[in-house]
Amino acid sequence: MPSGNQVILPTSSKGMRKVTIQKPDTLLSENIKKDVVIGGVTGALEAPPTGPYIEYTSIASSGRVFTAKFRGTIVPEYAFAYLAELTSVDMPDNVIAIGDNGFYRCPKLSLTSLPSGITSLGDYAFADCSMLTLTSLPSGITSLGDYVFRDCPRLALTSLPSGITSIGQYAFRNCSKMVLTSLPSGITSIGDFAFLNCYQLSLTTLPSGITSIGQYAFNNCPRLALTALPSGITSLPTAAFQYCPKLALTTFPSGMTSIGAYAFKQGTGLASITLPPALTAIGNQAFANCYNLKVCDCTECTAVPTLGASVFQNAHADFKILVPSALEEEWKAAANWSSYASQIIGV
C-alpha cells in the first residue's frame, strides 16, 4: 500500500502485473524515473481514472525503460523527463496538452507525429530530445513556449501551425535540420536565441506584424535570405542576424532607432544599406566583416547616430559613407565616425 512518498511492494511478486500510485501529482514523475521491475516481470504504473495512465510495455533485464504507453488528456510536468532509454510513447488522440518538461531530456525518444488535438506545448516540453523527427505540429497550437524544441537536431518541420502568434526564447535552438521557408502570418514576436544555429532555415520574408526580435534570434542561420524587415520593428538587439551570409537587406524600417552590437556581423550578402531617419545608435561591430559592403547611405538621418567600436571593420575596399552635406563635418568629427572620415562623403 502507498505510504508517504513510497510504494511498498510485497516480498513475493508472483503473478503481479501492476503497481497503483494513488497520488500521481506528487509521485508519478518520481517513480517513473526509477526502474520498475517486479521479480523480472514487466511492471506498470497506474493512476486513478482522473489522472494520467502510464504503462511500461518493454523493460529490459536491466530494468531500463524502452517504450511506454500513455492514457489521459494532459501529459503532466516532468512526466517522462530524464528517461534516457525511452524510445517511443503511444499517446491517444484526445491528448490536448504537454506540460513543462514533459519529455525533457529523452535522448532516444523517436516521435514522427503528435496527437492532432494538442493545443499547448509547455516550456522545455521536448528539449534535448535528439532523436525527435517531427515533420509537423498540431494545427491548434497558437504559441511555442521557451526551449520547447531546443537541441532537437533531427526535427524536420517544414511549416508551423497558422495560428501561432509567438515563438519563445530558445524554442528551436540547434534544430539544424529544420527546413522552414515561411512563418505564420500572425506572429508578432520571436524570442531570444529562437532559431540560433538553424542551418537549414530558408526564410526569405518575415511576417509583417512582427514587432519584436530577440537577441541572437537568427544567429548563424546561413541560409536565411531576407530582403526586408517588418515595418514595426523599432530596434534590433545584440547579434540578431550575426553570421547570416545570405541576407540581402538594403533598407531598414523607418521607425528603427537602434541596431545592436554584432547585429549583422559577417553579413557578407550586404552590399549597400540605407539607414533609417529615426536611427540614434549603432552598436559595436554591428556590420563588421561585411566584406562586400560598399555603401552605407545615411542621407535620410536627421542627426548623427552614436557609433560603437569597429562597426564597419573589414568592409569592402571601396566602402563609403554618404551623409547629408550640411552635417558632413559633424559626422567626420563624431566619436568612432572619425575613424572613417576619409570615407565620409557629403551629398
What are these regions (language model features)?
Residues 77-79, 99-105, 122-128, 145-150, ...:
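Consensus positions within tandem repeat domains that build extended binding/scaffold surfaces
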Residues 60-74, 84-97, 107-120, 130-143, ...:
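Structural signature of tandem-repeat unit edges
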Residues 1-68, 72-74:
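Surface-exposed receptor/substrate recognition regions of extracellular proteins
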Residues 39-45, 338-347:
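A recurrent domain-boundary module in secreted/ectodomain proteins
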Residues 325-330, 336-337:
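Acidic glycine-/aspartate-rich tracts in secreted/extracellular proteins
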Residues 309-314, 335:
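A structural signal for leucine-rich repeat
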